[in-house]
């Protein structure tokens, strides 16, 4: 009985450590999202050459978030960050209609990688504050998200500068990572 109570207590209150890989095309808002969630404020960013890594505490999970640069020359290096990834956050600039096909190709290339087969997928349809931004439904269609089978995925409309949708996305991650581990 004591062992059962101890395990239940640990399951309910023990902090979990998870590894999150956050990627997307350049200028999608990845670094802005990372620091808005971490610090609660918008910071001035420059294009990420390489990566940023931060720990974000949310509910009972300690997220180690790897924000990897998205310039086309850097994208082949994304695979070096796949190992032990529990969740993938793919950030899309919803206002960038010209490169949505590039985003789709990058996302589908990643989700077909063996090292990411168990990672859950959260898509942030970012920059929803811009007047010509695609809705989450349109981004879902353009990214062919409905073709993703046997994978747990979710799309969340966001505005990184205002913080809209970010915590809802992390809430989804928390719920599904708790169920998976």
Swiss-Prot record:
Keywords: ER-Golgi transport, Golgi apparatus, GTP-binding, Hydrolase, Lipoprotein, Membrane, Myristate, Nucleotide-binding, Protein transport, Transport
GO molecular function terms attached to this record: GTP binding; GTPase activity
InterPro entries per the UniProt record, alphabetical: Arf1-5-like, P-loop_NTPase, Small_GTP-bd, Small_GTPase_ARF, Small_GTPase_ARF/SAR
Catalytic activity: GTP + H2O = GDP + phosphate + H(+)
GO biological process: protein transport; vesicle-mediated transport
Known EC number: 3.6.5.2
Gene: ARF1
Similarity section: Belongs to the small GTPase superfamily. Arf family.
Annotated binding of GTP, by residue: 24-31, 126-129, 160
Activity regulation as described: Alternates between an inactive GDP-bound form and an active GTP-bound form. Intrinsic GTPase activity is almost undetectable in vitro. Activated by a guanine nucleotide-exchange factor (GEF) and inactivated by GTPase-activating protein ARFGAP1.
Lipid attachment, kind N-myristoyl glycine: 2
Phylogenetic classification of the source organism: Eukaryota, Sar, Alveolata, Apicomplexa, Aconoidasida
GO cellular component, one term: Golgi membrane
Membrane topology: Lipid-anchor
Protein name: ADP-ribosylation factor 1
Self-association state and partner proteins as the record states: May interact with GTPase RAB5b.
Organism: Plasmodium falciparum (isolate NF54)
Recorded superkingdom: Eukaryota
Pfam families, sorted: Arf
Subcellular location(s) of the protein: Golgi apparatus membrane
Task of the protein: Small GTPase involved in protein trafficking between different compartments. Modulates vesicle budding and uncoating within the Golgi complex. In its GTP-bound form, triggers the recruitment of coatomer proteins to the Golgi membrane. The hydrolysis of ARF1-bound GTP, which is mediated by ARFGAPs proteins, is required for dissociation of coat proteins from Golgi membranes and vesicles. Regulates the transport of N-acylated AK2 to the parasitophorous vacuole membrane. May be involved in the activation of lipid kinase PIP5K.
Enzyme class, broadest EC rank: hydrolase
